[in-house]
Amino acid sequence: MMKAFFIAGTDTDVGKTVASKAILHALAAKDLRTIGYKPVAAGSDKTPEGWRNSDALHLQKAATVAVDYEDINPYALELPASPHIAAKHEKVEIDYAVLSRKLAQHKENADVVLVEGAGGWRVPVSDTDSLSTWVKQEDLPVVLVVGIKLGCLSHALLTAEVIKADGLNLVGWVANRVNPGTEHYAEIIDMLEERLEVPKLGEIPYIPSAKRKDLGKYINADVLLEL
């Protein structure tokens, strides 16, 4: 069994890494070999080992297969901005062939590979292209992470619509409560369950420092494994 999924978000800061970690933890509980892959990350810190992005480091730690950082995050861009701006600032060209080569490598070594996106679905990686082009090229099934807050319904439904229009398979979604004060939470979830028309993998409650916690209990990984 080898499965790969792309983790998309309705926007930046909606909890893609939190949801990815939760899914990785749930899969680890089933004794599966997992790898978290962050092809492009904008916003990295200089370390003695080189540039490191905190989200990519969280994925590296949550996975069950040990992988060198450079293979988890081939493009660790310094500037915390849209990837196309950060890449231009550093005079870097994001090469889809590199992303595909790393993905193929991960597929050989894991039962499940989670590929975490950057920003939202149409995030630019150059002046003329978006990361979604590469996702379409790889024909990756998509899991949508919805940060539950005011405005998320429109963002979620629009993103799901575009993913499907791009010819990709939206296989599930995760609710991540990013604001503990969001009103009408249950009603928002009900609407998303009705309108997204794909399985909900789980609901992650608001948890301070969630990226540092074990989140597997909030995810039903069987939905992905049965695909």
Swiss-Prot record:
PANTHER family (UniProt xref): DETHIOBIOTIN SYNTHETASE
InterPro entries membership: DTB_synth_BioD, P-loop_NTPase
Descriptive protein name: ATP-dependent dethiobiotin synthetase BioD
Organism: Vibrio vulnificus (strain YJ016)
The protein's assembly and partners: Homodimer.
Subcellular location: Cytoplasm
Sequence similarity: Belongs to the dethiobiotin synthetase family.
Known EC number: 6.3.3.3
